[in-house]
Amino acid sequence: MAGERRDSKAAAFFCLAWALCLALPGFPQHVGGREDRADWTQEKYSHRPTILNATSILQVTSQTNVNRMWQNDLHPILIERYPGSPGSYAVRQHIKHRLQGLQAGWLVEEDTFQSHTPYGYRTFSNIISTLNPLAKRHLVVACHYDSKYFLPQLDGKVFVGATDSAVPCAMMLELARSLDRQLSFLKQSSLPPKADLSLKLIFFDGEEAFVRWSPSDSLYGSRSLAQKMASTPHPPGARNTNQIQGIDLFVLLDLIGARNPVFPVYFLNTARWFGRLEAIEQSLHDLGLLNNYSSERQYFRSNIRRYPVEDDHIPFLRRGVPILHLIPSPFPRVWHTMEDNEENLDKPTIDNISKILQVFVLEYLNLG
């Protein structure tokens, strides 16, 4: 997760300004020198979820298994994986293999590019997994899979970034696996509105700074992909709309896995979607589906607001994409230390947040 400048008030104000000016519905956006936009690009602002009832929630949560996720997805990712390292390649192959093996039929693409870093030119590779590339609109769930680069330690320890962001990666893979049946149905649906709304999972490379957080040494993968999507016509063959405009909502996961996280509201224009997370959390609690949980330690807190922090959403925010940033405040105490490892993860918390996210995704995609 992003670096040393994230607590800067100036950076926070800059991000907030973008949030208020660019991300608000109806703010003019220029595509090919024109301001006119197809009606479908406005549908995100009036989109309504299908609220799951208790029976559906019980069914969804019964499909997920945190122990299986831990063994099959988290352990393979809990290795040193800074850009260009052998671990980075291994994790990338694991993510692609897991998604390609699902029945839903994901289109899994590797977006590889080179960028200048403090250590010279490095190769980066984002992973983009799209359920239905022909759908006009996509809910995006994203995280970064790289780990921060540290010089070799005298004690031989390496930084594995458990919360930052191995756990979010594993949660996204578990979401795709446990919801495979429902997502297969969505993929096969040929009737609107389901045919025009789908899911995209993005795993960014190069989120972390190599040396010191700066506009040029950070967010390598998200900066590159946002620029690429802004210049790629969407739907295919379109002349006035692009892939950026096809993003309904950009949900970014980061620093998840420590006990008792508090997620505040960072962007007011997506507060209604944050409210759904809060409501889902309460519903799961009422149904007795959250483990080692106390309502006094609520995760999603709409009564708490914080200035935005710099992360992979920034290049998309600057292009007018609505952002739902799921990052705790304060950060976990192990942030950017060698202690951000498996030993300091809290399995019940991860299981609980994973369930909440899965219900949220189904509701957003109207798969109730």
Curated annotation (Swiss-Prot):
Gene name in the database record: QPCT
Glycoprotein is among the record's keywords: yes
Listed under GO cellular component are: extracellular region
Identify which residues the record assigns to the active site: 207, 254
Entry protein name: Glutaminyl-peptide cyclotransferase
Q: What does this protein do?
A: Responsible for the biosynthesis of pyroglutamyl peptides. Has a bias against acidic and tryptophan residues adjacent to the N-terminal glutaminyl residue and a lack of importance of chain length after the second residue. Also catalyzes N-terminal pyroglutamate formation.
Where is Zn(2+) annotated to bind? 164, 208, 336
Main localization (coarse):
secreted
Q: Carries keyword Endoplasmic reticulum?
A: no
Which cysteines in this chain are paired by disulphide bridges? 143-169
The entry assigns this protein to a family as follows: Belongs to the glutaminyl-peptide cyclotransferase family.
Q: What is its EC number?
A: 2.3.2.5
Show the InterPro entries listed in the entry. Answer: M28_QC, Peptidase_M28, QC/QCL
> What keyword terms does UniProt attach to this protein?
Acyltransferase, Disulfide bond, Glycoprotein, Metal-binding, Secreted, Signal, Transferase, Zinc
So what does this thing catalyse? N-terminal L-glutaminyl-[peptide] = N-terminal 5-oxo-L-prolyl-[peptide] + NH4(+)
Q: Tell me, which GO biological process terms does this entry list?
A: peptidyl-pyroglutamic acid biosynthetic process, using glutaminyl-peptide cyclotransferase
For this chain, one GO molecular function annotation is: glutaminyl-peptide cyclotransferase activity
Q: In which tissues is it expressed?
A: Expressed by the venom gland.
